[in-house]
């Protein structure tokens, strides 16, 4: 009697586990099983919760757009860092005008940050002035330092 009860229960449990494994291996979750591009009201006349765009899909869409924005920002930062570090003799200014761009080893690197507000040539004197003011304040507050030329190295 006990075997007759346990055998169907075991088979049912096994089939449920196999079904869930199949669904998740195909990427099917509760919000993504069925997505109809047409409006659910137009196709059936009734609003079915299973065929509308779920909240999890909206969050995925927002994550995708923010990921694209973050990727674009990081690639712009990477290009600016490459432009600053790869050009020999650069004064940390990627906007300087090269007299002969065809003879330069890196013709594109001089114009990478023209549209970037943070690294525009208008901000360069302000940035140097701020760092010099900080250096003067630190040297005035610290008095005689054990390493007097720490900030001059950078």
UniProtKB/Swiss-Prot annotation:
Highest taxon of the lineage: Eukaryota
Residues that make up the propeptide removed upon maturation: 70-154
One MF term in the entry's GO annotations: neuropeptide hormone activity
GO biological process, one term: neuropeptide signaling pathway
InterPro entries recorded: Procorazonin
Function description: Cardioactive peptide. Corazonin is probably involved in the physiological regulation of the heart beat. Clock (Clk) and cycle (cyc) proteins negatively regulate Crz transcription in a cell-specific manner.
Family affiliation: Belongs to the corazonin family.
Protein name: Pro-corazonin
Lineage: Eukaryota, Metazoa, Ecdysozoa, Arthropoda, Hexapoda
């Amino acid at each position: 009697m006990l075997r007759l009860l346990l055998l169907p229960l075991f088979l049912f449990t096994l089939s449920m586990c196999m079904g869930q494994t199949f669904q998740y291996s195909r990427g099917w979750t509760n919000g993504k099983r069925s997505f109809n591009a047409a409006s659910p009201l137009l196709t059936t006349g009734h609003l079915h919760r299973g065929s509308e765009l779920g909240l999890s899909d909206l969050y995925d869409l927002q994550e995708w757009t923010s990921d694209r924005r973050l990727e674009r920002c990081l690639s712009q930062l990477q290009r600016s860092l490459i432009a600053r570090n790869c050009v020999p003799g650069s004064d940390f200014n990627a906007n300087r005008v090269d007299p002969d761009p065809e003879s330069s080893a890196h013709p594109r690197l001089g114009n990478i940050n023209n549209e970037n507000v943070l690294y525009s040539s208008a901000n360069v004197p302000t940035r140097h002035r701020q760092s010099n003011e900080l250096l003067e304040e630190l040297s005035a507050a610290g008095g005689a330092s054990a390493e007097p030329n720490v900030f001059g190295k950078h």
